[in-house]
Amino acid sequence: NVHDPRSGEIIESHICWYHNVMTLVHDWYMIQAGTLDEAAQKMKYDPELMGQLIRFVSSHEVGHTLGLRHNFGSSSTVPVDSLRSRSFVMAHGHTPSIMDYARFNYVAQPEDNIPREGIFPRIGDYDCWAIEWGYKPMFNAYDDVSDHFELEALTSARLKDNRRLWFGDGETNRTNDARCQTE
């Protein structure tokens, strides 16, 4: 990213797309969703499915350009039995953050009747909260110290009401926290 040092405004962003990403997402989907989606069992995916796979990876990368870090801890807030609940997965997704490496809902079984939308990661509760926290003007504070205290109070209140907003990157903080496994 290229930022304006005076305001922090993002002026320009770059997303690197490696030559093998298409093969990588194909293989991830085949292995992790092959029992749930017959289309995942093919050696060549139709353009619609490949487009969904590209949008999933692109959403994660755009999150980085907006300043979001990996959030490997968010998935630890989802009870495992909820991953097999069609109503839960359709309402909340299988991970609270597209910034996790949760990939696909491979816990779901064919008898759970979870459609493709419930298998794919999507922008979740944590991602929306992180963008709001970082970009939405929320306070009448005129200095960084006051703003900091107001943000801390708001964060504590939000986490109390929604544990899916929990953050743990497993990289710069909580490196020994089992809830923040990377892969």
Can you name each region flagged by the protein language model?
Residues 21, 25, 73-76, 80:
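Alpha-helix termini
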Residues 62-78:
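Catalytic Zn2+-binding segment of zinc metalloproteases
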Residues 75-183:
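Conserved catalytic/binding loops enriched for acidic/polar residues
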